[in-house]
Design a protein with these regions (language model features):
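Helix C-cap/helix->beta junction micro-motif
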Residues: 28, 55, 96-97
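N-terminal Rossmann NAD(P)H-binding glycine-rich loop of SDR-like oxidoreductase domains
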Residues: 2-27
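Catalytic helix-loop patch of NAD(P)-dependent Rossmann-fold dehydrogenases
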Residues: 74, 81, 85-89, 96, ...
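NAD(P)H-binding glycine-rich loop region in Rossmannoid oxidoreductase-like domains
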Residues: 45-82
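Adenosine-cofactor binding site in Rossmann-like domains, unifying the SAM/SAH pocket
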Residues: 28-50
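Glycine/Thr-rich phosphate-binding loops of Rossmann-like dinucleotide-binding domains
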Residues: 18, 69-70, 110-112
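SDR active-site strand-loop-helix element
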Residues: 11, 35, 60-64, 101-106, ...
Length: 126
């Protein structure tokens, strides 16, 4: 059943994955809210909560990430803030507000040659 009142927040909308979702969104009858680091601070629970409550968000698709792998090794604090701590805050707010959260991580973890579903215990092979 299509619900035009279904509100979906997509973080990281200027990145590669967020841009793809933005492009495909016109094929669906949902209300999409595309945000970037300037429109919502995902490192702040208050910012996330306020945005979600104001816009009656039903689902969060988190595409935001610190993806500059080489730079992240030199900027560990910011990489950790975006890739771990912000995700935790999104999860906590989602849980508190009964919002579904989809978190997508895309950078260089597995080689794609496995024929079974991947799990955290598998050896990485970027």
């Amino acid at each position: 059943m299509l619900n035009k009142n279904y509100n979906i927040l997509v973080t990281g909308s200027n990145g590669q994955l967020g841009s793809e979702i933005k492009e495909l969104s016109s094929n669906y009858f949902y209300n999409f809210f595309f945000t970037d680091r300037n429109s919502i601070d995902i490192t702040s629970k208050d910012s996330i909560r306020s945005f979600c409550q104001t816009n009656n968000i039903n689902v969060i698709i988190n595409c935001a990430a610190y993806t500059a792998v080489d730079k992240a090794e030199l900027d560990e604090l910011n990489a950790d803030l975006v890739n771990r701590k912000a995700v935790k805050k999104l999860a906590l707010v989602s849980q508190d507000l009964n919002i579904k959260l989809i978190h997508i991580s895309t950078d260089y973890v597995f080689d794609g040659r496995n024929f079974k579903p991947y799990c955290e215990e598998l050896q990485t092979n970027p």
